[in-house]
């Protein structure tokens, strides 16, 4: 059975370790820094079997070359981005098993945050990188609102029980923004309180469940009247299509 373990890195990154404790093997997702990965492997007596990358940003790839120097393992990453060390380029609809773990993953193209961003989907789990966050989504550094809205639609179509393993601990800021958009959403108010309590205890707020995102994440709720009304009020524009609502929400969040 595969266990997913969070490795905090930098100020707010999460590196994810997919672990088979019986085989004493692990695969790492988005290792922005090699040192905490090596420390986690040593502490649990694990050997690295693969490196998995969602997008090219350095805080998700900065540890790849150092890890490869110590562990000559395959590196899976986006085919349409330049990531040092990638030996197994991926794009939708590729599917593969993680070496040593037997964990099946399928690939979704989710451009928006970066042009070639991919997400990795297992049974009941999503490694979303910086595409979908708990309560939010990634900034549009390279893609368009239309691309990101379509990408989030793919992710939102996954089963509600899917656990979302995202790349950053941005949840409090995301939910506080979401509460500006939907102050009368009781699910959002409850989730914000739970997240605040978790952070006060020093606990992570991720993974979330896709059901939580459907109920509280404004970027997955751009089709709803209350969200559209809030976006129109902020933008001072009539927004006839959900993608226009999404684009206004993203600008609003960027400026908040």
From Swiss-Prot:
Zn(2+) 1 binds at residues 55, 57, 113, 130. Its cofactor is Zn(2+). Keywords: Hydrolase, Metal-binding, Zinc. GO terms for molecular function: hydroxyacylglutathione hydrolase activity; metal ion binding. The keyword Hydrolase applies. It catalyses: an S-(2-hydroxyacyl)glutathione + H2O = a 2-hydroxy carboxylate + glutathione + H(+). One of its GO terms (biological process) is methylglyoxal catabolic process to D-lactate via S-lactoyl-glutathione. Monomer. This is Hydroxyacylglutathione hydrolase. It comes from Alkalilimnicola ehrlichii (strain ATCC BAA-1101 / DSM 17681 / MLHE-1).
């Amino acid at each position: 059975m595969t266990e997913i373990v969070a490795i905090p890195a930098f100020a707010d990154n999460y590196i994810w370790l997919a672990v088979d404790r019986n085989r004493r093997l692990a695969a790492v997702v988005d290792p922005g820094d090699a040192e905490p990965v090596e420390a986690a492997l040593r502490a649990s007596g694990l050997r690295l079997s693969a490196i998995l990358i969602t997008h090219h940003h350095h805080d998700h790839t900065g540890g790849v070359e150092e890890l490869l120097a110590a562990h000559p393992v395959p590196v899976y990453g986006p085919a349409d981005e330049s990531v040092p060390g990638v030996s197994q380029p991926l794009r939708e609809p590729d599917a593969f098993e993680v070496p040593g773990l037997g964990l099946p993953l399928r690939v979704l193209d989710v451009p928006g945050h970066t042009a070639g961003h991919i997400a990795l989907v297992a049974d009941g789990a999503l490694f979303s990188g910086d595409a979908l966050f708990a309560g939010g989504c990634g900034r549009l550094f390279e893609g368009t609102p239309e691309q990101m809205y379509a990408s989030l639609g793919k992710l939102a179509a996954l089963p509600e029980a899917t656990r979302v393993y995202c790349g950053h601990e941005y949840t409090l800021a995301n939910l506080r923004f979401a509460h500006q958009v939907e102050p009368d959403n009781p699910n959002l108010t409850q989730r914000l309180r739970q997240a605040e309590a978790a952070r006060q205890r020093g606990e992570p707020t991720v993974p979330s469940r896709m059901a939580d995102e459907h109920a509280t994440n404004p970027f997955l709720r751009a089709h709803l009247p209350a969200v559209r009304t809030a976006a129109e009020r902020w933008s001072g524009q009539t927004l006839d299509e959900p993608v226009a609502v999404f684009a206004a929400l993203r600008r609003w969040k960027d400026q908040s």
